[in-house]
Amino acid sequence: MRVFLFYISFILLLFSLESCYKEEVIFNVEANNFLELPLILRINNKDCAFDYSQNTLRYPIEKDSIINFEAFIEFQGYSEVIFNNHSLKNNLINNLGEIRTNKQYEIKISTNNTAKVLKLRFTNLPIVQLITASRIYDEPKSLARFVINFPNQNTISSYVGIEQRGGWATLQLPKKSYSFSFLNSTFLDEKTPYSVFDLEQNTDWVLDGMYTDNTRLRNKIASNIWKAIPGEKHYGISPNFVELYLNNEHQGLYCLSENINAELLLLLNEDALLYKAIGWTGPDCFETSSDDLPSIERWDGWVQKYPNPNQRINWKPLADLRNLIVESSDEDFILQIGTFIDIDNFIDYYLFLNLICAKDNLAKNIFLTKQSLIDRFTIIPWDFDNSFGSSGIQPIVNNNLYKRLSELNPNNFNKRLKDRWIFLRIEAFKESNLLSIIKKSSNQIQKSNIIEIENEKWATIINLETEHANLMLWIVDRLNTMDNYYQNL
């Protein structure tokens, strides 16, 4: 009898606790064991993202406005939800009337005698939610759930291993950038390739915070310009704007893109190579050479990204290139440089980095790759924060490789450089095309109030209209500078 009474009392206690819990909706709670947050409001099978400090909800839509927006609505079953003074029906299609981006709507959620008023805004940008039970560090990676709600595609949800991204200076910024890998389980070593934004599948991805770029455009438009140059070997990333939430905190505007790795470049040959320059030092600028080759993944300001350093280290092809550039006689340089590098690719790279004044990309912000040992090196740019006049108007820039190419003129380098500039000015570098690339990206992030959120979250005073207008004036002026230079080459 006592045992029976004990169980009855225990059940009543649980019921009482559950009833107390249902007296109000708990908003800012930790994720469950599956790294999921509790339901607040779901529209057409996509959870609205919630910011606890601002009491706001956000939801992505494809168009700037929708008349008679009919949507399947879900919320916690013991609550009442009022949208714009209209009571919503749970687990049914509701007509929300006309909705538009950049307009605030009131949501009132009531449970018994408690109520909370939230502000709902619609955005044209995809929304990424990172849900984690632990802090995200520089390294090692932490486990998180990655959820992305698109305006016009199905939701993607997956476990990821995530860490902060960048060098020492970047890691000190208040707004963090992240690198992450998709996982097929909760084990951090079980990586799996994934496709986002209909891009090719990749295991490794980047969320770029763009904190030091007041235009919030430089990396995206530079990548678009580089990939618009006609040619077979213009490898690069395809950044896409997203809004990022870390649990229940809006982090602002980010660019989501693939990482430059063997998957992106389709490096299948066991003799393929991928090196990444990581420092503004003599070796990176091809100012010095060395035959002291280590058996580790880092050497003289470079990192071997492929082959996997745990399996094989191969610095000799890079050492041979450096020795040719730094140590060779003029005659040997003229005869051999065309067998070491893809001249056409390096010409396009030189024109591109001078067009956008990407001085950093002379050294640390580059990748060198080749598909096999008999192939020639091609060059890949990345990270364009310091470009498009961010350091003021700059003259035509060089490193030691380009100085020797210009001075010694192997393979008729200077004429090919000038002819290529004239050709690219017809289409890829046409003023209207470059301005169109800027305007398209600018329009994407000015349709919603995302910069207001950025300014409030990170205590900045960015005016996108002014920044983007100045950027377009700068590119027009830069084209004139480049035209004058190549006319006299």
Task: Pin down the residues of each PLM region.
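Middle-to-C-terminal accessory/interaction subdomains
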Residues: Y159-V160, G167-A169, L173, P307-L362, ...
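Positively charged n-region of N-terminal signal peptides that target proteins for export
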Residues: M1-F4
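Short, well-structured beta-strand/strand-turn elements
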Residues: S79-V81, I229-E243, A358
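Beta-rich interaction/scaffold domains
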Residues: Y21-L125
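Structural recognition of the beta-strand scaffold that forms the well-ordered cores
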Residues: Y178-S181, T203-G209, R216, E243-Y245, ...
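Conserved NTP-binding catalytic cores of kinases and kinase-like/nucleotidyltransferase enzymes
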Residues: I61-I66, I73-G77, N85, T111-R216, ...
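C-terminal motif of bacterial Sec signal peptides marking the signal peptidase cleavage site
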Residues: S16-S19
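Internal "kinase-insert"/substrate-recognition segments embedded within catalytic cores
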Residues: N184-F187, P193-S195, L199-Y211, E232-I237, ...
